[in-house]
Curated annotation (Swiss-Prot):
Biological function: Catalyzes the condensation of the acetyl group of acetyl-CoA with 3-methyl-2-oxobutanoate (2-ketoisovalerate) to form 3-carboxy-3-hydroxy-4-methylpentanoate (2-isopropylmalate).
UniProt region (Regulatory domain), positions on chain: 392-519
Superkingdom in the source lineage: Bacteria
Protein name: 2-isopropylmalate synthase
Positions bound to Mn(2+): D14, H202, H204, N238
Keywords assigned by UniProt, alphabetized: Amino-acid biosynthesis, Branched-chain amino acid biosynthesis, Cytoplasm, Leucine biosynthesis, Manganese, Metal-binding, Transferase
Co-factor(s): Mn(2+)
Pfam families reported in the protein's UniProt record: HCS_D2, HMGL-like, LeuA_dimer
Length: 519
């Protein structure tokens, strides 16, 4: 019979400690709501005694969360426990999580105590916390470097004192999977009352072992996994919960456990955490990276088109993604080109695949990735500057005021004759104003879907590179602009996107006319 693994999220406590700036109460609450929607069993949302701001955020989240258990961290000190209980008292379900170092190096060099004193502090603190709640978790800080005899001794004392959950952290990410699983096995062998508590693990990623150690702990009997969304956290980060959750789901045949997580919320939760914490997700990040369900190799693309299971061990819909991405690059084969043309509504008799594939490879070698509208242009036009630059920047002027409103005057060359069209608009900031003016001049009702700004050093200046995605009539179009002036780079990117849209419109018109003539 499969057993449940409790998912303990510490994004708002351990994860937040790694951020360059603290989250506001409002931002923390937004993340907490996302975690609750995801279905985490326990969310550790702060260290109440550490600051008035942390107390307020824990208190606010405790008042608003309905389903998940809300947890606060405390040292083995009465004052810490009192403050944590005060912050948590309005929660429907709450847990007090207390911790104490157990490794020789921490006890001697950090606390200047002996192990017997640690035992006494553990007993007293757990019993004291039990005055406020039956749900007390005790963590053996630096358990990964604690002697097994001492670890077994303190775990037994903690359970006898009333701790319902015993956490075994690999605080400095020192252990490797077979070593860490042996620690958990040893606890089950040597602590007679181990079945009276849930064994939890909290692994750090200093050697890249956090997820591996957590999985090995599950196999050894751990039934709570602590971690963070996207693996954010101190130093190299924590166990990435999305990876644990999907490993349990996909490899249930070996792990024989389950979680109560709503898997289809994983991607959205990851995005919320990334955006609010201002921590971009690496493209190759497992489960939630932009390349996680993307295929560029021609062999892989052909295999996926024939049967997704050839190269995909999970369905992207399981995490809330709608589709697999087959990127068009110089490594793509004819099958991928046909697939993208079919997605745009074209049949094989509409174009010559051999001719299209030749010019596609030339363009892919030049620019790396080719987008659908560029492929469409290759199929039905000579991919010339005439088509690429229907719109071109003549000049612009931006005037901003202290009220956060900005006025933009944009002058564009339009059409083959390069007639200048002008527009003046007001917006909330210079880029908003400029984009409104460009939309009015082009008469293309577009919506800005994504705006990314990257900086690069160029000679003695910092060059701003702007990447945008806009939507028009249900399709996405891209634009890139580079300049030492960020506003100009943004305008260049938008003009490129407008040119791509204009070109696609011309191709559609020409194709319809051709089809009409054939009939």
């Amino acid at each position: 019979m499969h057993q449940q693994v409790i998912i303990f999220d510490t994004t708002l406590r351990d994860g937040e400690q790694s951020l360059q700036t603290s989250l506001s109460v409002k931002e923390k609450l937004q993340i907490a709501f996302a975690l609750e929607k995801l279905g985490v069993d326990v969310m550790e949302v702060g260290f109440p005694i550490s600051s008035p701001g942390d107390f307020e955020s824990v208190h606010t989240i405790a008042q608003n969360i309905q389903n998940s258990c809300v947890c606060g961290l405390a040292r083995c000190l009465e004052k810490d426990i009192d403050i944590a209980a005060e912050a948590l008292k309005s929660a429907k379900k709450f847990r007090i999580h207390i911790f104490l170092p157990t490794s020789a190096i921490h006890i001697q060099s950090k606390l200047r105590k002996n192990f017997d004193q640690i035992i006494d502090m553990t007993t007293h603190s757990i019993r004291y916390a039990r005055k406020y709640t039956d749900d007390v978790e005790f963590s053996c800080e630096d358990a990964g470097r604690t002697s097994i005899d001492n670890l077994c001794r303190i775990v037994e004392i903690a359970i006898k004192s009333g701790a319902r959950t015993i956490n075994i952290p690999d605080t400095v990410g020192y252990t490797i999977p077979n070593q860490f699983s042996e620690i958990i096995y040893s606890l089950y062998k040597k602590v007679p009352i181990i079945d009276q508590a849930i064994i939890s693990v909290h692994c750090h990623d200093d050697l890249g072992m956090a997820v591996g150690n957590s999985i090995s702990a599950i196999q050894a009997g751990a039934r709570q996994i602590e971690g963070t969304i996207n693996g954010i956290g101190e130093r190299a980060g924590n166990t990435a919960l999305e990876e644990i959750i999907m490993a349990i789901k996909i490899r249930h045949d070996l792990l024989h456990v389950y979680t109560n997580i709503h898997h289809h919320e994983i991607y959205q939760t990851s995005q919320v955490v990334s955006q609010l914490c201002n921590m971009p997700i690496p493209a190759n990040k497992a489960i939630v990276g932009s390349n996680a369900f993307s295929h560029s190799s021609g062999i892989h693309q052909d295999g996926v088109l024939k049967n997704k299971k050839n190269y995909e061990i999970m369905n992207p819909k399981n995490i809330g993604l709608k589709k697999v991405q087959l990127n068009l690059t110089s490594r793509s084969g004819r099958a991928a080109v046909k697939y993208h043309m079919e997605k745009m509504g074209y049949q094989e008799h509409d174009y010559n695949i051999d001719e299209l594939y030749k010019v596609f490879l030339k363009l892919a070698d030049q620019k790396g990735r080719v987008f659908n509208y560029e492929l469409e242009a290759l199929a039905f036009t000579k991919y010339s500057q005439e088509y690429l630059e229907y719109f071109a920047l003549e000049s612009f002027h931006i005037h901003s005021t202290s009220s956060a409103l900005s006025n933009a005057i944009i002058n564009l060359y339009c059409g083959k004759e390069k007639k200048i069209h002008s527009c003046s608009t007001t917006g909330r900031g210079p880029i908003d104003a400029a984009y409104k003016a460009l939309t009015l001049i082009s008469k293309l009702p577009i919506k800005l879907e994504k705006y990314q700004l990257h900086s690069k050093k160029y000679e003695y200046n910092i060059l701003g590179q702007v990447n945008i995605i806009v939507s028009y009539q249900g399709r996405h179009f891209h634009g890139i602009g580079s300049n030492i002036d960020i506003i100009k780079a943004s305008i260049i990117a938008m003009i490129q996107a407008l040119n791509n849209i204009w070109q696609t419109k011309q191709i559609t018109i020409n194709h319809k006319n051709t089809q009409h003539i054939k009939k």
